Curated annotation (Swiss-Prot):
UniProt source species: Eimeria tenella
UniProt superkingdom: Eukaryota
Biological function: Casein kinases are operationally defined by their preferential utilization of acidic proteins such as caseins as substrates. It can phosphorylate a large number of proteins.
Compositionally skewed regions (Basic and acidic residues) per UniProt: 317-327
Protein name, UniProt field: Casein kinase I
Entry-linked PANTHER family: CASEIN KINASE-RELATED (PTHR11909)
Catalytic activity: L-seryl-[protein] + ATP = O-phospho-L-seryl-[protein] + ADP + H(+); L-threonyl-[protein] + ATP = O-phospho-L-threonyl-[protein] + ADP + H(+)
Calcium among keywords: no
Transmembrane regions listed in the UniProt entry: none
Database matches in CDD domains: STKc_CK1_delta_epsilon
Lineage of the species this protein comes from: Eukaryota, Sar, Alveolata, Apicomplexa, Conoidasida
Major enzyme class: transferase
Residues at the active site: 128 (proton acceptor)
Length: 335
């Protein structure tokens, strides 16, 4: 069945799902370019897609921000059509056997700090910094890290008056507990400092392979959040970053020292990691741990795609009712 959305996009197979809807591969009928199509039921209890689309519009033009092509309502669905990207940092972390080299972690830190600073410069905080929400580009953009998923983002200051949102307590945890800042666990309203602290935990997750508060047994969500908070607060930063360069300790201590309304010194944090990078003798060549692994998979995917293209066009019956392709191909690396 030929399903079209946004006037000129053909809906393809499902390539992923998030907490607020499903993501499909799409094709621009005029150009043949592939896109990502995100769908969310209009009957969703907490619709977020139209809000997220508006965020992408506000962030338009930023390096590492996916291009928004169209958003609106089609039938029973809120629809957002954006640039198709490659795998997430979580996917790539798994491809690399769940451990990244210091060189790769530092190149990621540089780009991720840039993305967070840009979002903050547009008066928003992300509030869900995690490896799943950073994707690499495709083709010529394979060395660019993109920030995605702005459904939980919040305006932290008035663009006109520059007035900061007020300090509040008693807030429920927004985001992902594993990477949430200590203040977020304590129920304090999030601000710029919390995005940066979360990034610190992401970087240590990549360095170590896991975080000390992962895999804790709990009976309820609240119990789990409480146990994560207790473990996070009782693990000294020096212990968390043990056997890794002191810059990671300095980074997290700096983030935790910031006051609610403080503007972080992004340049200082980038310089911290860049100095370490060059002191270690690394070349800023955009060759990550996964570069060759991913390129190899991508070539194999394209080869198989070409082999199967002819067969697919005349053999739609091969797909089962769910839309899955039982031909047993390599797993797709798109989001």
């Amino acid at each position: 069945m030929d399903v079209r959305v946004g006037g000129k996009y053909r809906l393809g197979r499902k390539i992923g799902s998030g907490s607020f809807g499903d993501i499909y591969l799409g094709t621009n009928i005029s150009t043949g370019d592939e896109v990502a199509i995100k769908l969310e039921s209009v009957r969703s209890r907490h619709p977020q897609l139209i809000y997220e689309s508006k965020l992408y519009k506000i962030l338009t033009g930023g390096i590492g921000i996916p291009t928004l092509y169209w958003y609106g309502i089609e039938g029973d669905y809120n629809v957002m059509i954006i640039e198709l990207l490659g795998p997430s940092l979580e996917d790539l972390f798994s491809i690399c056997n769940r451990k990244l080299s210091l060189k790769t972690v530092l190149m990621l830190a540089d780009q991720m700090l840039n993305r967070i600073e840009f979002v903050h410069s547009r008066h928003f905080i992300h509030r869900d910094i995690k490896p799943d929400n950073f994707l690499i580009g495709r083709g010529k953009k394979m060395s660019i890290v993109f920030a995605i998923d702005f459904g939980l983002a919040k305006k932290y200051r008035d663009p006109r008056t520059q007035s900061h949102i007020p300090y509040r307590e008693g807030k429920n945890l927004t985001g992902t507990a594993r990477y949430a800042s200590v203040n977020t666990h304590l129920g304090i309203e999030q601000s710029r400092r919390d995005d940066l602290e979360a990034l610190g935990y992401v970087l240590m997750y990549f360095n170590r392979g896991s975080l000390p508060w992962q895999g804790l047994k709990a009976t309820t969500k609240k119990d789990k959040y409480d146990k994560i908070m207790e473990k996070k607060m009782s693990t000294p930063i020096e212990v968390l970053c043990k056997q890794f360069p002191f810059e990671f300790i300095t980074y997290l201590n700096y983030c935790r020292s910031l006051r609610f309304e403080d503007r972080p010194d992004y340049s200082y944090l980038r310089r911290l990691f860049k100095d370490l990078f060059f002191r270690e003798g690394y070349q800023y060549d955009f060759i990550f741990d996964w570069t060759f692994l991913h390129a190899e998979r991508e070539r194999e995917r394209q080869r198989r795609s070409m082999v199967n293209q002819g067969a697919e066009s005349g053999n739609q019956w091969r797909r089962d009712a769910s839309g899955r392709d039982p031909l047993g191909r390599l797993p797709q690396l798109e989001p």
